[in-house]
């Protein structure tokens, strides 16, 4: 019987948990194996574009997400050298899309909301402190061995989904796939900072354009907590980052008002994609399959679209007898959209924000960005890009 199907998901981040919820709500038995002891609370992705919201609504989690985060319609480009603010507004999509908003919600909060909803389902189990250390794949089954707090425990199932991030065990050790691409040379520092950007007229998301003080500034919650991400030389010592944050903020913030750095996390940015997202009973999604720099919020959005598309087709394979060939179509479309759409756009976003030198090229870009803000048809077209990332099968 189909109810006996068990899907093993390796990785308990938002992409893995969304996949579990979509499968379990359709009656598929699921187990999620997460190596860490709890959801990470380090500064990570927090913006979810408007095409994601109807999926969260369908899964029954949107109301909780909105209550824990905030919804916004506009965002701004700020030219650091002149202090000019250029606003684009999602309200131009009203009547065209179901929910013309972006959701701001910390990735850790989203994970905890998803876990609470999963707890209410009898056919899903989430196991923390359960790293996978070995795996055997047969023609109709998979078998994984756990380490950590459950050494030697064996979990058997019919499908294995690798949602275990950029350093994916499933990609490296089970599928033995390459992860070709580039690593951007700069280091980026994400901070959670308490400061009142609202009173300075910043958008809830503000992209500050400058080749030295370029930054992404996003409101995290209603308590004046904001994410501020900036770039620095990777040759600088890691141990001096906290002091350098204060130095950068002296130039980055247009005021001497006090601020509080609550948390910070340095990281490198990448553009990489696996050779294959599927081989037989093993499927990769999210950062396990492809990683992009997060400028513009396309990384987690792309991973969520992986999850939504996969749950749709895998539930059909398990419950409706649809041919497994549809999973190859899923793989081809998700890789193509990352390679042809997501990675190029995210790379353009990063270069425009952090690397434009003063001069004619930057002036042309600013003039074009400003002209879009005054032309509702062009702004509508520009804002609908995230829709192109989705897969319908």
UniProtKB/Swiss-Prot annotation:
Its cofactor is: FAD
Pathway annotation? Alkaloid degradation; nicotine degradation
pH-activity profile = Optimum pH is 8. At pH below 7.0 or above 9.0, there is substantial loss of activity.
Report the EC number(s), separated by commas if there are several. 1.14.13.163
Q: Please give the knockout or disruption phenotype noted for this protein.
A: Cells lacking this gene are not able to grow in nicotine medium.
Q: How does the cofactor attach, per the note?
A: Binds 1 FAD per subunit.
Q: Name one GO biological process term.
A: nicotine catabolic process
The enzyme's main class, written as a single word, is oxidoreductase
Q: Which InterPro entries match?
A: FAD-bd, FAD/NAD-bd_sf, PheA/TfdB_FAD_monoxygenase
Gene3D superfamilies reported for this sequence: 3.30.70.2450, FAD/NAD(P)-binding domain
What this protein catalyses is:
4-(6-hydroxypyridin-3-yl)-4-oxobutanoate + 2 NADH + O2 + 2 H(+) = 2,5-dihydroxypyridine + succinate semialdehyde + 2 NAD(+) + H2O
* KW Plastid (keyword) present: no
**Family stated for the protein in its record:** Belongs to the PheA/TfdB FAD monooxygenase family.
The extra comment attached to this record reads: The catalytic efficiency of HspB is higher than that of HspA.
- State how it assembles: Homodimer.
| UniProt protein name | 6-hydroxy-3-succinoylpyridine 3-monooxygenase HspB
Q: Which species does the entry assign this protein to?
A: Pseudomonas putida (strain DSM 28022 / S16)
Q: What is the lineage of its organism?
A: Bacteria, Pseudomonadati, Pseudomonadota, Gammaproteobacteria, Pseudomonadales
